[in-house]
Amino acid sequence: RIVQAVAPRPGQRLIEIGPGEGAITLPLLREAGQLTVIELDRDLIPRIQAAAQGVGELEVIHADVLTVDFTALARGGTLRLVGNLPYNISSPILFHCLEHAGAIADMHFMLQKEVVERMAAPPGSKVYGRLSVMLQLVCRVEPLFRVPPGAFTPPPKVDSAVVRLTPLPEAERPDADPVRIERVVRHAFGQRRKT
């Protein structure tokens, strides 16, 4: 279902963050013909490369995704990002991607369901917070579908969900320093429990 939601087409610059054992890597590669993966775990890279033999053109970047310059990687075009993000560092990865929104066409991520709910929360909602504000200032956030624990081996203790993030046109994004906006939002939501 993730691959159907992404609907990759040949010629698009598709980047998978953290392919792990390659559960969605091969279906993406089959559809797109070429795929770049960013993987930190050096031990997984040969397995992914071996599995991709004869399926399509696979480029592997061995790096921490938080150090990857997506704007440079786009080479003047736009990227489509996909990934089953590690739940413990999903927010830093999302904020890092926002820094490169101008080089990204869309993002499809599987995350903990509660994180997706916070990302898409409307103002006034109990779960509306810093993550909601920062993402919605830059992207359209569309929760797509829930993924039950049984879809994984071993099954996690939490439900997951897939979300689509589509960066807004530059004219619709705030014309202000993102660092300053983030500081104000962090301060505002840091104070809300004290009132």
What are these regions (language model features)?
Residues A188-T195:
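Pseudouridine synthase
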